[in-house]
């Protein structure tokens, strides 16, 4: 257990940040799944619409430092390639 006041405060802050980051990661995963589901269903228009929203979510999360900007870029690239491959 933390002994100093600043260590206790950092422990409180890290718990709060962990919960917030977890909700952001959940939103990211949900957005990606929606794009993949639309691609698998063969609905190109819905997939593109979902890609726009998921791209926004990915960029926001990468800006906040929840995960690296290269990960967001890689995911966006793979999702858009999957949509382009639909024909």
Swiss-Prot record:
One of its GO terms (cellular component) is cytosol. The keyword Ribosomal protein applies. InterPro entries: Ribosomal_bS20 (IPR002583), Ribosomal_bS20_sf (IPR036510). GO terms for biological process: translation. Residues 1-22 are annotated as: Disordered. HAMAP family: Ribosomal_bS20 (MF_00500). Binds directly to 16S ribosomal RNA. Belongs to the bacterial ribosomal protein bS20 family. This is Small ribosomal subunit protein bS20. The lineage of its organism: Bacteria, Pseudomonadati, Pseudomonadota, Betaproteobacteria, Neisseriales. The gene is rpsT.
